[in-house]
């Protein structure tokens, strides 16, 4: 089961580019996080509420596949969707340039539900209201 794509626009800042005048590769992972954070806010389970409830979602795997560079002042669209939401959570990403719809990067991150002691938890049991909000987001989209 996967959700629809959640989209957010971002303009490439000068500080995100390198000596080759393209976006430094690590910034794409930062943009993945921006997309993920905003998507979680839209599920009704924003990171702030998760953390206040003692639930953390650390990244345990990250992959990015580079297709074309982004450059200073490009307007990009960060697309994020949730594709797994059980013991592990998987988010998929696409970053495209708005002007020509060119795919710049795609990838994914995998996360684990853990408590403050970094011990794995079952979200369905630990926080059923949060689990149901995420499940509802998946099924309605």
Spell out what each predicted region is.
Residues 108-118:
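Short helix/strand-capping connector loops at secondary-structure junctions
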Residues 2-59, 116-141:
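Hot-dog-fold acyl-thioester-processing enzymes
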Residues 2-9, 61, 75-77, 88-90, ...:
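Intrinsic-disorder/low-complexity, polar/charged segments enriched in Ser/Thr/Lys/Arg/Asp/Glu/Gln
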Residues 17, 80, 109:
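Ser/Thr-centric signal marking residues that sit
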Residues 105-107, 122:
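A structural microfeature
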Residues 64-98:
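Hydrophobic beta-sheet segments that form the core/acyl-binding groove
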Residues 99-101, 117:
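Solvent-exposed strand-loop boundary residues in beta-sheet-rich modules
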Residues 16, 95-96, 113:
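Hydrophobic beta-strand positions
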């Amino acid at each position: 089961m996967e959700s629809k794509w959640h989209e957010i626009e971002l303009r490439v800042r000068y500080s995100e580019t390198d000596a080759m005048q393209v976006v430094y590769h690590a910034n794409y992972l930062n943009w993945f996080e921006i997309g993920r954070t905003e998507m979680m806010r839209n599920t009704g389970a924003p990171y702030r509420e998760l953390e206040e409830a003692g639930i953390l979602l650390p990244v345990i795997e990250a992959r990015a596949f580079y297709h074309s560079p982004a450059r200073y002042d490009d307007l990009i669209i960060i697309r994020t969707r949730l594709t797994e939401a059980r013991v592990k959570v998987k988010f998929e990403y696409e970053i495209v340039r708005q002007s020509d719809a060119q795919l710049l990067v795609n990838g994914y991150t995998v996360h684990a539900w853990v408590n403050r002691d970094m011990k794995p938890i079952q979200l369905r049991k630990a926080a059923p209201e949060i689990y149901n909000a995420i499940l509802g987001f998946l099924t309605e989209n």
